[in-house]
Amino acid sequence: MKSPCRAAAGWLVLLLSSCCLGYVIATEWAAAVTTDNGILFFDSNWRKISSAAHQYSRISAFAYDEVLGKLYFADLDHPEYRLFALDYDDTDELHKVTKLLPKSAQTAYISGMAFDHLERRLYWTEKGTRSVYYVAIDELLSSTRSAAAAANGTAAAAATAVEATTSAPPPSSSSPVQLVATVQPDHELAGLAIDECRRHLYWTNCYPKTSNIVRAAMNGTVLNVHEEQVYLPKGITVDHYRNRLYWVEKKYGRRYTIESADLEVNDQRTLQTGLDRLPADIAVKNDYIYWTDQENNEIYEMSKEPNAPSRTVYRGEHPSAVILRANLLLEHQRNNPDCRSVVDRILENMQNSKPASVLQQETQQQGQLTVCLNNGTVNHHTNTCLCQPAFGGKLCEIDLCNNYCAQGSCRIGRDNRPRCDCDRRYEGDRCDRNRCDGFCLNGGRCQFSNGTAGRTEEEMGDRTCLCESTGYSGARCENPICGTDYCYNGECYVEEGKRPKCRCKAGYRGERCEEYSCNNYCLNGGHCTLGNETTVPECECGEEFAGQRCEIAVRLCSTYNEDPQWQQYCLGISKTLPLMEPKVTYCKESFNRTVVYTSLCFTVSFALLLAVVLVVSRMMKPPRPRITKKMVVTPMTSRPPTTQCEITIENCCNMNVCETPCFDTKLLKKSKKEDKQFLLEDIEDVGGSYRKLPNCGDGTAERK
């Protein structure tokens, strides 16, 4: 059993260790961005805290190893090597860069990169060979360290630059690079991502005519290809929080989009679209998306919801790729059912692969190793703690739910973040806001209806507002009972029962003071005026009428002054008034418009009827017969030439009725068909009608 003094000393050492680590915690990087001037590191508020790898000016892709805390990146301008590893140290300005793989056909043009923590493999896409490759990173790092130690003779070689650099050995005949898959010639590989929980690879093809998103097994077997509504996709990432994919596209012309789909590359959604942007890479963290824009040299942050606004978190040196250090797999996915088994295997492998320095420390200095509280796991590669769900801090000493929810119960979500189930009277991320605060407007009083203590997301209608004596109504006392235009000529007030009432100005009346007091007040032509003091309407009546509103005819009071029914109306009116007959005036220039209009309509109708009859009779009247042929009477064979008679009918219209044989009054009684038949028969008959004709010329010629 430990003594109290030793136990107290142990806790003191632990407390001092936590205090000493405070500066480290404050300066830990949360995001890394590749630029034309190396790699930049930022804190959680996107403030620049450090930079590294300044001599590498064309970094095309990089990936993060959560177990070793290393950054692997590819530089396309280095004359000899393509793949590098960066050891970032928060407390040291000298960030060690290790050269891993030399330039070759397999590493010439690396465009995308991803790291698999379970199998400890680094994957990348290479444009020149149109292939996906991987390398076992632990074996590569081990061979690199061995070769460097053999070449230098000692590990304490002095650094000659800002970053210390360790070179890898010359490439051997057996390359550690392994081929995963090769795409078709009309494909151009771009981004690469890994779903470590479900063991899938995703890569993008940005060739214009065959653009697509490919999902494949870890051995390169293609599972499905998504081509619909995909054009020039670039960076791609896996969101383990929501089990979705996110990628960026450069659309036709000036357009760009941020796209999303499920892990089977279905259910595609466009989260954002716009103009004049050149997106290159994308990363996710919690509820936000971050993507780089090489057109304006900016990094944007936006929510994962569609059409969410974006804000600029960085503007500077041509950012190309971005990584968010969220310890997503090891810390935040232990509550994810799809990732729990993978995370447990990763942690087991991590414990079984302790560095030699740690093994030596365990042998020589037992009891002085780093201790993680609350069943946390020590990562001996980085000398940090991987905490159990519900705990955090450098040594897992912080209970994430301790005093987190002000009015409610705390639970740990699948992203290893605390969540609050609020009591029915409170809301907010930490249940720190009363739901009645500011709910009722204009002085209304808020109260909760009876219900259970628990409250679901849909149960929002359990609070009501009491708007008594406020002059307002509505669910939140937002509607004024007395609107600005309720009383037209007066003042509005609320009476008991929440009903609006009007106090009218002098000279107005009505429920809403809408009527002038003198309007239609005086009858029978009386003149209305308002009293100067009482503002009560008064009537000035003519000679024939009397009464308060000129409603009593004076002549009736003179006639029925003894009638009790009339006495109440005629009281006060003189009984000696003469019997007056009502005056009737006539307008001298008046006329009966009805008679005039009726006569006018009758005249017009008769004229129209007459015109119609004339037109119809004219159309029904048969036309006169007309002869259009030239008639010649040929000489008779039995007659001598001197006795022949010849008549030529040229124009019957030039003859009068008595002279021409073309006109016969009897023909008018016949129809056109009979008239034509008679005419033809008469022409064919030589004797015909001409036997009835008188002698031609001077009468000397006679017909025989």
Swiss-Prot record:
LDL-receptor class B repeats: 69-119, 120-166, 199-242, 243-288
Cytoplasmic side: 616-704
Location relative to the cell: Cell membrane
Domain of life: Eukaryota
Keywords on record: Cell membrane, Differentiation, Disulfide bond, EGF-like domain, Glycoprotein, Membrane, Oogenesis, Repeat, Signal, Spermatogenesis, Transmembrane, Transmembrane helix
Annotated signal peptide: 1-26
Alphabetical list of PROSITE patterns matching this protein: EGF_1, EGF_2, EGF_3
Known function: Has a role in spermatogenesis and oogenesis.
Protein source organism: Anopheles gambiae (African malaria mosquito)
Chief location category: membrane
Protein name from the UniProt record: Protein cueball
Protein's membrane topology: Single-pass type I membrane protein
Spans traversing the lipid bilayer: 595-615
UniProt GO cellular component terms: plasma membrane
